[in-house]
Amino acid sequence: VPPGFTPFRVD
């Protein structure tokens, strides 16, 4: 999982 990754939102 990349840093800052979420399944809901990726900025």
From Swiss-Prot:
Query: What keywords is this UniProt entry annotated with?
Result: Amphibian defense peptide, G-protein coupled receptor impairing toxin, Hydroxylation, Secreted, Toxin, Vasoactive, Vasodilator
Q: In which tissues is it expressed?
A: Expressed by the skin glands.
Annotated GO MF terms: toxin activity
The source's domain of life comes to: Eukaryota
Q: Name one GO cellular component term.
A: extracellular region
- According to its UniProt record, where is this protein located? Secreted
Main location (coarse class) = secreted
UniProt GO BP: defense response; vasodilation
Q: Which residues carry this modification: 4-hydroxyproline?
A: P2
Q: Which family does it belong to?
A: Belongs to the bradykinin-related peptide family.
Question: Any idea what job this protein has?
Answer: Produces in vitro relaxation of rat arterial smooth muscle and constriction of intestinal smooth muscle. May target bradykinin receptors (BDKRB).
Q: What is this protein called?
A: [Val1,Thr6]-bradykinyl-Val,Asp
